[in-house]
C-alpha cells in the first residue's frame, strides 16, 4: 500500500518548492488527489508560481497532516493520464469553478495543467 493511501480523503496538502528566482523554500497549500503512489496537483491558472517552481526544480516536499515526504514533480502531458487524473480530482472535490477568473469545473478537472509527484524518499 502506498504511503498516500491513508490521506486520500484529506482536503489539502502543503507543497514546498524552491523558488526559481529566490532559491528559497516556498510553501503552498493545495487540493490534491491520489492515484496509487502518485500525488496529483492541478494548477487552475495560466500562471502559478508553485507549478513553475516545481518545473524548474523537480524535487518537492509534500506535507500531509504530520507526514513529510520528498518526491519528484513532473508535468503530465499524456492525454489519457491527464484525463484519469482529472477524474480523480472530479470525484474528490465538488466544486463549481471560479466565475471571477472564468475557471469552470470542467476546465479545472480536464484542461488545466497537472503536476504529478512520485518517486518518494
Predicted regions mapped to residue ranges:
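Short, structured beta-strand-loop surface elements
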Residues: 45-121
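Short coil/turn motifs at beta-sheet boundaries
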Residues: 8, 25, 108-110
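Short beta-strand segments
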Residues: 10-45, 51, 60
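Residues at structural and domain junctions
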Residues: 9, 40, 71-75
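Short, basic/aromatic recognition patches
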Residues: 1-12
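A generic local structural motif
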Residues: 1-2, 27-28, 101-103
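Generic signal for short, ordered secondary-structure residues
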Residues: 1-2, 33, 64, 68
Amino acid at each position: 500500500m502506498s504511503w498516500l493511501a491513508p490521506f486520500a480523503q484529506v482536503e489539502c496538502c502543503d507543497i514546498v518548492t524552491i523558488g526559481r528566482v529566490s532559491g528559497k523554500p516556498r510553501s503552498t497549500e493545495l487540493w490534491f488527489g491520489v492515484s496509487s503512489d502518485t500525488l496529483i496537483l492541478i494548477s487552475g491558472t495560466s500562471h502559478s508560481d508553485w507549478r513553475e517552481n516545481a518545473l524548474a526544480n523537480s524535487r518537492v516536499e509534500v506535507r500531509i497532516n504530520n507526514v513529510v515526504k520528498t518526491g519528484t514533480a513532473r508535468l503530465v502531458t499524456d492525454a489519457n493520464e491527464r484525463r484519469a487524473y482529472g477524474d480523480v480530482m472530479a470525484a474528490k472535490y465538488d466544486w463549481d469553478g471560479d466565475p471571477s477568473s472564468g475557471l469552470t469545473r470542467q476546465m479545472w478537472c480536464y484542461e488545466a495543467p497537472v503536476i504529478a509527484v512520485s518517486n518518494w524518499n
